[in-house]
From Swiss-Prot:
Mg(2+) binds at D490, D496. It comes from Deinococcus geothermalis (strain DSM 11300 / CIP 105573 / AG-3a). Pfam families: KH_1, PNPase, RNase_PH, RNase_PH_C, S1. Residues 557-618 form the KH domain. Its EC number is 2.7.7.8. The lineage of its organism: Bacteria, Thermotogati, Deinococcota, Deinococci, Deinococcales. Gene3D superfamilies: GHMP Kinase, N-terminal domain, K Homology domain, type 1, Nucleic acid-binding proteins. It catalyses: RNA(n+1) + phosphate = RNA(n) + a ribonucleoside 5'-diphosphate. This is Polyribonucleotide nucleotidyltransferase. Its main location: cytoplasm.
Amino acid sequence: MIAKTYTTMLGGRELSIETGKLAKLASGSVTLRYGDTLLLVTAQAREERSTLDFLPLTVEFEERHYAVGRIPGSFHRREGRPGEHAILSARITDRQIRPLFPKGYRQETQVIITVLSADQQNAPDVLGAIGASAALSLSDIPWNGPTACVRVGMIDGEYVINPTSDQLTRSSLDLVVAGTRDAVNMVEAGAQGVSEETLVGAIEFAHRELQGVLDLIETMRAEVGREKFNFLVDSDLSTDLVPELSEAARAAGLRDALLTTKKQERSANLKALRDRLIAERVPDPEAAGAAEQIEALKAAFAKVEKQELRRLILQEDLRADGRNSKTVRPIWIEARPLPRAHGSAIFTRGETQVLGVTTLGTERDELLVDNLTGETNDRFLLHYNFPPYSTGEVKRVGGQSRREVGHGNLAKRAIRAVLPAFDDFPYVIRVVGEVLESNGSSSMATVCAGTLSLMDAGVPIQAPVAGVAMGLVMEGEQYRILTDILGLEDALGDMDFKVCGTAEGVTALQMDIKVSGVTPAIMREALAQAREARLHILGKMAEVLPAPRPELSPTAPRILTLKINPELIGKVIGPGGKQVRELEAMGAQVTIEEDGNIRIFSADGAAAEAVRQKIEGLTREAKVGEEYEGTVVKTAPFGAFVNLFPGQDGMLHISQMSENRVNAVEDVLNVGDRLRVKIANIDDRGKIDLIRPELEGKIAPREPRAARAGGDRGGRPPRRE
């Protein structure tokens, strides 16, 4: 195959897609270039059909350190398991392409995105999604694309397509949108409290801008695309059984079984009804062909269950737990359930329950994030845990799944927007969401529980954040938007639309759409309905914690800050770090910055205060005119040396000790004597001349040191060099 390159303009920069040059043995492969960011994307499928009853699709996002001219920092100096950034980038692509595989397609399919070059300005995540669409479109893999993906920022009130990394730092919006020619099928966003109308406008803007990419991929497919292979679909015996089984199920109490309030009771009732109907139709399960008939009846019953649930929602505005489409489940909240945690809260909404826990740490607890954008330190961590008992199941307990990473990132983006600036609240913050029960919207409950735990810890957040998951049931022109969806409604519905924000605006958004035809008008309606629910939830949260606690939790560590002259940092550190080690031995961690900012961290407030006072003493600077209660530490024929504060002495000349002539210093002062002194002068070398305040104006002042040719040598000529 001859290599061919196709180009289009996107966001004012050229996007080029080349095929036929690299990885030619893959079913589909393309190379994308945008600026100096270069990606290789391949798509491959097995010939044999999987025995799984779902689509075995995997998307891998491979970050190569050579892409930015670096050697990996791991022990073996090679890339290891994908990090969080790579997982989130892979999920963007997965969520965009998965809904467009044909019904019944079960071949194991793999998309691999490899970052070959990264200019650290043009993000590779959305390019990977475009590349996956192109590779699948050109391959022989059955797929109903293409799709395209863009990022939208908002700078100075204007939408910007694919903002650079530098531009994103000034953007109030970070929105990723994927879609087909006629519809949007995936949205992901983090925002600084923008309005719902701004979001809809950004989504519409993105959908218009991605049309050029769709044109490009369709041109490529027409010119160099391969013919799609045929795939086997299991004969669906269940379809013919649905009409009769549906009538029988309704007569046998399907409605009552579906409208059981509790999840486990509902599942048990539906299973009992299904088993009874199957037993009536297959009296002898051991007979020839009975197993196939039973499986077909189970599949048919699942379809009947879905049809009836959707009918109840659309025609009667009645949901499985008895609510209408706009009602939020009952909410129960408890603040500070954990006595030793820095902040904690339990948030329960229906049968979804999350324990949120906040822990405060120092800069030494920052997470070093090493990816292709460079090394950064993350001062806000949010970890989402989804144990199997939360859904009443037994599964292997191990590392985080990709789902957990994605849900945790959504909650993190929602809350990060309201955190105080580090200069105002110099703590590293970790929030953990422990999902204790799950029947839909556990990530949104994590946002609520995490926010409450921050407020319980005394973190001065700008405003409380709440989240709610919205759903959609759509049949032709008829649709109904659902507030606070159940797990069952998520599985059987047409949209999962998670919205997080404050009372003023949206801070995070995630939308996955399973059907085409979701118009901007429907999105506006869903966002408006989500706002009503969000305000309701925020009201319930305010009943328990109307604002962050005025003081940090008694168990939380204390951080004291002070500013010193940068030239005095050496005094705090000491020779070889001796002084700072002595300070930390007092029970605190000390962080010193080059600009003189010092932070003292200790679980013991008294220890932190003691270290602060010690540092102030070490770095205190004397000023002309200040008075001190000092102690004589040394005498000399010409005067006495008086300690003003730790590390700082001054000299009281013999002529300034009394109104009368003093023959010997020891006639007036001795080591250990305390007296009141005042700073009269500080020379260029930092030497301090003292006077006694009570004698000021009664005796002639001494000339400043700089004016005395002989220094303190009693008028004798200076020493020869």
